[in-house]
């Protein structure tokens, strides 16, 4: 399902507002179209409803702004996702058994690590998708182990750096088009050119952006060195543990017939995903705060002159 989300972002990102100002964008950090005092006086339930309506409205506006071809692609992906969910529910037992058997068989093959690494390297280049699927597959095969983490982390770092280098050196014009697809990334490009930019890049890497998209888009920002991009990716390698954990729990669910054990595994998957989501959004807002601080510092430096 994560891959379908990545595909939506890749297809939907081609349309963007003509106004490139970060804080005036319809897809910005601050909800400027909501009245602050009205939201402040709402209960937490009313705030959830308000945010839901706002996101639904923004989604409809973005969909209406797409061309017919892109609308058809989004609809196709939505229908495909519904079909996959239906098949998963109906054929759950057979699917789980097949996953367990396949993972056990692949674990015994000497070439499996090499194949996984090559596939992850391949999907590191935009607009290819499949990183989330391959990461979960690594967890299914090797579980929460050092070997699984090493395979996933190493191939992720190498693939990211390789994709970044190719887009920076050979496909820079295409990388610039990628960065213009997302107003947030385009706006923060001015604060990603320092010697310590790897911290900001690491925060971007942990934010909810498609894996391959980030590799190519950041290459379109002038002043970012391959060294800093590589350091940022190394810093974020612990995130691979979440994929391995979820993959291992999925395999455990297929290996047992106990309802209570399956329930525990399912709850642990939900908790792991919840932890990842909370951590991601916490870092997202930390990133927003840091961006505003750097913008303020730059503005103050200009005011001096």
Curated annotation (Swiss-Prot):
Give the Cytoplasmic compartment stretches of this protein. Answer: 91-113, 169-227, 284-305
The keyword Glycoprotein is annotated on this UniProt entry: yes
GO terms of biological process kind: mitotic spindle elongation; vesicle-mediated transport
Keyword hit for Membrane: yes
Transmembrane stretches in the record are: 70-90, 114-134, 148-168, 228-248, 263-283
The highest taxon in the source lineage is Eukaryota
Task: List all annotated glycosylation positions.
Answer: 41
Give any Gene Ontology cellular component.
Golgi membrane
Provide the residue span(s) of the region labelled VTT domain.
139-250
Intracellular or extracellular location(s): Golgi apparatus membrane
**What's this protein's family per the entry?**
Belongs to the TVP38/TMEM64 family.
Q: What is known of its domains?
A: The VTT domain was previously called the SNARE-assoc domain. As there is no evidence that this domain associates with SNARE proteins, it was renamed as VMP1, TMEM41, and TVP38 (VTT) domain.
Q: What is this protein called?
A: Golgi apparatus membrane protein TVP38
Its ancestry begins with: Eukaryota, Fungi, Dikarya, Ascomycota, Saccharomycotina
